[in-house]
Amino acid sequence: MNNSSLEHPGAIPGQEYRFDAFEDGKVLHKKKKGRMPAMGWNSWNAFGSGNTEQLTLEMAKCIKELGLDKLGYRYLVLDDGCYRNERVNGLLTNDEVKFPHGFRYLADRLHEMGLKFGMYNDIGTNLCAGAAVGTCGHEREDAGSYISWDVDFLKVDNCYYLWDDATFSDKENAKYVFAPALGKVVIRRDEVYLEEFSPGINMHIVGNGIHTEDIDGKLFFTHIGTFDGTGPAQTPVGVESGEVVLDADIPEDGTYDISIELICGRSSESGRGEWLQAASECSQTTQYQFDGLIDGKDCEGSGFCIKASLKAGRNRIRFMNHRRQENTLMSYAKLLEGLKEAAPDRDIVYSLCEWGKTQPQNWGWKVADSWRILNDITFAVGSDGNPGKADWVSGYTNSVTSQYNKAVVMDEFSGTDRGWNDPDMMVIGMDGLNSAQNRTHMVMWCMMNSPLMLGLDLRRVKKGDELYRVIANEEMIALDQDKLGIQAKRIYTDLIGAGSDKEYITNNDRVDILAKPLSDGSVAVSFINLSGSRKDEGYSVSAREIAEKLGDRMAGPDTFINAGSYVIRDLWTKEESKNCDGVFRINDLEAYDNYTIRIIPG
């Protein structure tokens, strides 16, 4: 394989990387299917860039002493801050102060303890903390290093990325993200006029996000690209990009000139870039006619012309820029390709951390086991002796509820045949959350099949104490790891009526009811009070309502509905009761708390 270019985005290597193939069911580079959400510990929330070999081994010792490995917490992942700031002879190298014995030594020690070893990198030129050791342009060498270090897990970030205006990237990279503003289009053959198309008349928008703007008295389409999902403003459900289309009647097969009035730019705010994709569709066949940057001299006016090979009949011409997603997919795929080339049979969990920027719920499953859905859950990370701080609510992504509110409506994107939505590492055990919030945080992540990556200094946990009882609740963990692999669906919220499973809601003054089907035919149901006030209105849901909402995702819905009785098991108190009417109730919920039960048909 060749490393990716540092000069320009690569050519699309095959149709399987295209936007049109995001739902084709075909993974890239033999990505493994069927893996359950990863469980373990990541160094970032606990220690930031200050993690060390000694601290990692102490965390491993805690995992063993607490018996957390027996519950599934086996991966210990070194996050940012573990490498030297520059490459040595083109290769990644350990920070000799923090990790004096090298990474293979640490991997061997963890493996001797029956644990797994994870590391971190970035598809950009630098890591998020600044070290100039990103994988871009070094994928083959880095893959070889990770194999030689016996890595079991790889988290890959998205800072300093060259082909998007990502975190710490050049803002002018927006030229790759958006198409130019698009005005009139004229189709000719042999300089003979065939047809003219104008915005809003016989040129139309499909999808979402495109604006129609008057620029100097002319109509143009702008913001032709993909929504940025890094922050909490954009719903993850539905079409996340837009195209401009026109339908042309072509008299005969041949080469035609498509002249386009356009205005280029390099600003996400203006929604004008310099990268254009144009494709024609005729008789269910798609042919890409152009996919590249517009040359500077063609960036304004009507001088840009595409030589297009068109078929006789009705042709749909599509103007778009899906490269924000396609480029990012290619970058993550390139490192996976390197890993598979270096060791085809190695089983490495691949965790994407591009913060939901390019809507990875659409394409991440092709290469990865999980994909982050937002920016970080906390920016107040800890250090040795400082537990760091987390929040329940915030105006941005840095809170438990910000992550939950997005992930809870993303159930359609996860599963054993795809991978898992990742609302970031857990913040249980950091300062800022009370006991009820810690419990509900654990419930949310387990019900949503999220990766369970602890982010606290485990020396703060004593076997049997309050923190331990949360992170070591075997019956909660069993929900997350249930082999059916179905993320819970929100079947009710008291803020709206219909559409509770797909409506993206950021108002936390509410109660949600989640239902998660399990492989043995039982169903987990959680009543969650997100608010800071006691809720005493009473809430209920019936077996029939649960089955109707979950549909064919359930194992044996008819058996569940028609059961004469049910055993109700409280997954926190372990108390059991019998239910004979098929209606499951809670009279009140304390602030931030939850009532989570397993309903077993009798």
Protein language model features and the residues they cover:
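N-terminal module-boundary/linker segments of secreted carbohydrate-active enzymes
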Residues: 2-53, 336-340, 348, 528
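Glycan-recognition surfaces
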Residues: 329-333, 337-457
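Extracytoplasmic
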Residues: 174-326, 535, 544-565
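Carbohydrate-binding surface patches
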Residues: 445-448, 453-455, 504-555
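C-terminal beta-strand-rich structural cap/linker in extracellular carbohydrate-active enzymes
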Residues: 315-319, 578-602
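Conserved, mostly hydrophobic/aromatic
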Residues: 41, 76, 110, 350, ...
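Aromatic- and carboxylate-lined catalytic core of secreted/periplasmic carbohydrate-active enzymes
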Residues: 190, 217-218, 222-235, 412-424, ...
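Aromatic-lined carbohydrate-binding/catalytic grooves of carbohydrate-active enzymes
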Residues: 55, 59-171
